[in-house]
Amino acid sequence: MNEVITRFQESLYESKLHFSVKPILIGGMAMEYYGMRKSGADIDLIITDEDYKNLAMQYPEKKKDLFGDLGLVIDNFEIWRSIAHLDYNFYKKEAMEEDEVFIISIDRLLWSRVCAMEVEKYRNDLMLMKEYYYKIYTNQEFHEEARLHEKSYEKIKGPIFGGKYED
């Protein structure tokens, strides 16, 4: 089992939090799940409106309102009903399903970082995500073909027309 999932499950058990619908893991732990960087101490989740209302009744002193996005901070969990007023259903699209949690899809994670890129931490995450996309999705055949002409690319510093390489 993935170490991130194990840590999530241990924290969930210790906190005694219960959800009627699997939460969606977002933020730093999702970045770690995809192998981009280590997460911080907090665990960021998106939950359904129903689960939010139930937890808000149990923990009224833990409620948080960030420009209309309602959440709770309980133990090391930061739990949101929405982010940028986008709800559970938006973030669930193409999410990875694990035993007790969904992991935000890589595309939704990228989108969330783009929306917050004025914050340096998230700009740095965008650079990590760019490298992740190149690592996972680069067509290796095309990449190897291009490597044959690296000297020409360095010398010409622009497009090469008519196959006139200077290797």
Residue ranges, per PLM feature:
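Compositionally biased terminal segments of proteins
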Residues: 1-167
